[in-house]
């Protein structure tokens, strides 16, 4: 499963998007986002209208790395920040973030991530197909692996092996068919 929306750090007392208007000054009237064409950015522009935030906030469209740099700087300085966020993402493993409630459901509800394989894969590699059909991740597990890749030597294979060692019971459940 995954989510998209606005996130705020634990020191931030705002818990809902509809509370942002009264705290515009604390957030410096800025919502930090990613590239203009991203779906989450279109929803953020809709949210400005839906929640009447247009006159109080502007969206800072950057890149994901720049958004993450701004988040790191705000955390270090203990400043309030609101940004576009989604799960799974390693920032949720590294920082104490939360999604703001979205009473108008501009961002929708919980989303899902599905494994997809090419047509005929089940016949071509039935054992691999069975493992993939049993594999299930919680966002927190995937975020931990993503953080290890981000912070580690950058080799996803090495970090995946590390994750498998730490989570051997989970991996075993993927490898053994239910009786």
State the predicted function of each range.
Residues 1-34:
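A conserved helix-loop-strand patch within extracytoplasmic ligand-binding domains
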Residues 1-11, 111-125, 148:
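A bilobed periplasmic-binding-protein/Venus flytrap-type ligand-binding module shared by bacterial periplasmic
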Residues 35-102:
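Ligand-binding pocket segment of bilobal, Venus flytrap-like solute-binding proteins
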Residues 65-66, 88-139:
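Periplasmic-binding protein-like
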Residues 139-179:
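C-terminal functional modules
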